[in-house]
Amino acid sequence: MRLSKEFIGLGIITASLIFGSSLPDIYKGIVILIVAGCLWFFELLPLPVTSLAIPIMAVFLGIFNLKEALTYFAHPIIFLFLGGFMLAQALKNHNLDKFIAYKLLNYGKDFKTTCFLMFLSAYFLSMWISNTSATLILLPIALGLLHKKTGKLRDFLLLGVAYSASIGGIATIIGSPPNAIASSYLDYGFFSWFKVGFPISLLLFLICTLTLYIYFKKWIPKEDIAIQARMELSRNAYKLLVIFVLIASLWIISDYLSEIFNVQYFDSVIAIFAIILLFVFNLVEVNDFKKIDWGTLILFGGALCLGGVIVKSGANTFLSEKLIAILGNLTPIVLLFLVVTITIILTNFISNTGLTGIIVPILFGVSLGIPKEILILAVGMSASCSFILPVGTPPNAIVYSEGVKKEEMMKIGMILSILSAAVITLYSILYL
């Protein structure tokens, strides 16, 4: 009888508990790291389920007690994401996300300009809502603009939307879970991340757009075309717009507010305040909590817990020493480029949240002639650069399902991956 992959995953977890119980703590941490990495990579269990298995393994192997293990699932940054998800749900409920996209697209004069504005819409929306939602919002508009056209033009427009949505997530701490994982090790707030994340995301967005235009130049029509879409906002939508601007403004100055009120993770306080405001003004309902992406929050908590396991068991120090022995002779810029490149390659095969949760704790304990802050920020930013495969990220999968050729995605994706690795490396060395 053929075993299902879920039973194989369960068997691996059980075996790790049986054979790992007699090992020293360092090796217990490495066992949990390997098991979690394998389960995430091969998706033997759903990603959130693997994340829930991490604290259980940590408890049974004696690294944490249950209270310590589950604390990571109530980390303040989890609540920052919860607030961001609820704000995104409110935008969806009242069509404010579509309104923002349509407003931008109305400025298009010809096909080229309209496409750029569509990419810009995906980039901007992805700072505040998931890259999946940003792609799905713009997909019907993009398909309508194509008028059943196929081939290179379809690849150009749809890949531009998908890649822009992924890159936009780098800009803010709530844009992508890897940002928050990296921030949790650096005690970064919303504005601290925005200061470093927005410039590199904007640069990558412009490079991505330029690369797509150059690659597909001869297939882009020159005829005039414009989207004249009108949307009327409801009274509640205007209320939401005010709250959205207020919360975004508070997040931007959250580091200063944290100092004034002497409260750590003040951006998480703002996120909780945002949820309360949304309910007070009847912009969301209790049922909207059911629509939140709880799987991502659990995955995020599991990644944080894995990081805690690696640090407490001493596995990060052990692995760091091995890393130094292998890479210690490389120059800092070559080493940084190598770390960024490996992250970008792996993020095409494994969840970027899980990947960041594995790499960051190891780098946190290493000394390779590069400040830890630069290494961790570079990994956090690189984890969102998944351009090569349809399975790499939901936006890639969405546009692939709409007819984008895998060969074109791989060609453009490889070019963008190389450019992204070089740009992030130089940015990290020169700017950070």
From Swiss-Prot:
Primary location group: membrane
Cystine pairings recorded for this chain: none
Chain coiled-coil ranges: none
GO cellular component: plasma membrane
GO MF terms held by the record: succinate transmembrane transporter activity; transmembrane transporter activity
Single Gene Ontology BP annotation: transmembrane transport
Pfam families, per database record: CitMHS
Assigned keywords, A-Z: Cell membrane, Membrane, Transmembrane, Transmembrane helix, Transport
Superkingdom of the source species: Archaea
Subcellular location(s) of the protein: Cell membrane
Membrane-crossing segments per the record: 7-27, 29-49, 68-88, 124-144, 156-176, 196-216, 241-261, 266-286, 291-311, 326-346, 358-378, 379-399, 412-432
InterPro entries: Cit_transptr-like_dom (IPR004680), Na/sul_symport_CS (IPR031312), SLC13A/DASS (IPR001898)
Topological relation to the membrane, as annotated: Multi-pass membrane protein
Family: Belongs to the CitM (TC 2.A.11) transporter family.
Name of this chain's protein: Uncharacterized transporter MJ0672
Native species: Methanocaldococcus jannaschii (strain ATCC 43067 / DSM 2661 / JAL-1 / JCM 10045 / NBRC 100440) (Methanococcus jannaschii)
